[in-house]
């Protein structure tokens, strides 16, 4: 007997990929980090500001200390593929959140295939992947907002299985 057909509304997909470079300082290094994100994504990055002053770190409130860019669609999948190649398709179980999203970091952006430029330098970055299913929009839309049912919500186990199957990857840990 043939295997039971999978419900197309239950299929997982990548909602968005957020690339983040957090330096903890503003100035020239931050603008160079923004150039790296622009080269990688083809989009203009947004700067994040410090929420409050921390004198020990030399950070003032509202000072720009990081930059990030949100990528969606096929471009997000292509950039994620390059990031996972750097990690050799190996993530730890603790990289996956209870809500089914996952994230990881890389040490050097040149591992992604970007040519090294001495005027820019080398930056590490974080990849955050937000997963969703068809029908999840009912919880986010403005009009006629609804709730996503318990059986339709995404958990870590769903995402880990999707990750292993799609990328033929390894998840380490218990």
UniProtKB/Swiss-Prot annotation:
Presence of the UniProt keyword Ribonucleoprotein in the record: yes
Superkingdom assignment: Eukaryota
Keyword Cytoplasm carried by entry: yes
Keyword entries, A-Z: Cytoplasm, Nucleus, Ribonucleoprotein, Ribosomal protein, RNA-binding, rRNA-binding
A biological process term (GO) from this entry: cytoplasmic translation
CC per GO annotation: cytosol; cytosolic large ribosomal subunit; cytosolic small ribosomal subunit; nucleus
Pfam families: Ribosomal_L5, Ribosomal_L5_C
Database matches in PROSITE patterns: RIBOSOMAL_L5 (PS00358)
Family classification: Belongs to the universal ribosomal protein uL5 family.
Other notes: There are 2 genes for uL5 in S.pombe.
The protein's name in its UniProt record: Large ribosomal subunit protein uL5A
């Amino acid at each position: 007997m043939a295997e039971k057909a999978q419900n197309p509304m239950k299929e997982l997909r990548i909602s968005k990929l957020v690339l983040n470079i957090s330096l903890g300082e503003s100035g020239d290094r931050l603008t160079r980090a923004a150039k790296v994100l622009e080269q990688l994504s083809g989009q203009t990055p947004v700067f994040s500001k410090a929420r409050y002053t921390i004198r020990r770190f030399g950070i003032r409130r509202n000072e720009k200390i990081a930059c990030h860019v949100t990528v969606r669609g096929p471009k997000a999948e292509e950039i994620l593929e390059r990031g996972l190649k750097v990690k050799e398709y190996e993530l730890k179980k603790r990289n996956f959140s209870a809500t089914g999203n996952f994230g990881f970091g890389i040490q050097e952006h040149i591992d992604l295939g970007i040519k090294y430029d001495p005027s820019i330098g080398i930056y590490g970055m974080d990849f955050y992947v937000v997963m969703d299913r068809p029908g999840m929009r009912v919880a986010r839309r403005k009009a006629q907002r609804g709730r996503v049912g318990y059986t339709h919500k995404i958990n870590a186990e769903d995402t880990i299985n999707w990750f292993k199957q799609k990328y033929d990857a390894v998840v380490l840990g218990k």
